[in-house]
Regions:
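Membrane-proximal alpha-helical signals and transmembrane carboxylates
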Residues: 1-153
Length: 153
């Protein structure tokens, strides 16, 4: 019995004194929005952080995005999914990559650094989970010169 306590103590000391493997906070990359578009047959996925993924389908493009990001990219922090009109049929493929409570917008204009702030101030009604169930019309987002305009679905 005494021997087990000694072994347990040694194991506890080894755990406490061993080097910790943490993650450099500077390498954590939480995305605010994800933009889905096409270039011919190639699906493109871009984030507000400037990361880009390409592939033959959504899963392949998102996988490429995760691999090519210079750090730990978090898509489940994304509040918004922006989709070009030609990719609207791909929205259900975003499930499992982005949380179901993310708002979905169709936009012909590519997002920029002001898009996230605009969407924070003007909330849409369409969530990814609703799109996957087909229960909600898509909200639109358009650009008029320098300003964004929300078109609720």
């Amino acid at each position: 019995m005494k021997r087990w306590w000694i072994l347990l103590g040694i194991a506890a000391m080894a755990c406490l004194l061993s080097p910790f493997q943490g993650t450099d906070v500077g390498k954590l990359r939480p995305a605010q929005w994800v933009y889905l578009s096409r270039d011919g047959e190639t699906v493109l996925v871009r984030t507000d952080l400037g990361d880009l993924g390409k592939g033959g389908g959504v899963g392949e493009a998102l996988g490429d995005l995760m691999e090519s990001a210079p750090g730990a990219l978090f898509l489940d922090t994304a509040d918004y999914i922006l989709v070009s009109p030609e990719c609207a049929d791909l929205i259900p493929n975003m499930g499992g990559w982005v949380r179901g409570a993310a708002e979905v917008y169709v936009t012909a204009a590519p997002p920029d650094e002001e898009t996230g702030a605009f969407l924070e101030a003007h909330r849409g009604k369409t969530l990814l989970r609703d799109c996957m169930l087909g229960t909600q019309a898509l909200s639109g987002l358009t650009r008029d010169g320098e300003r964004w305009i929300l078109i609720d679905g």
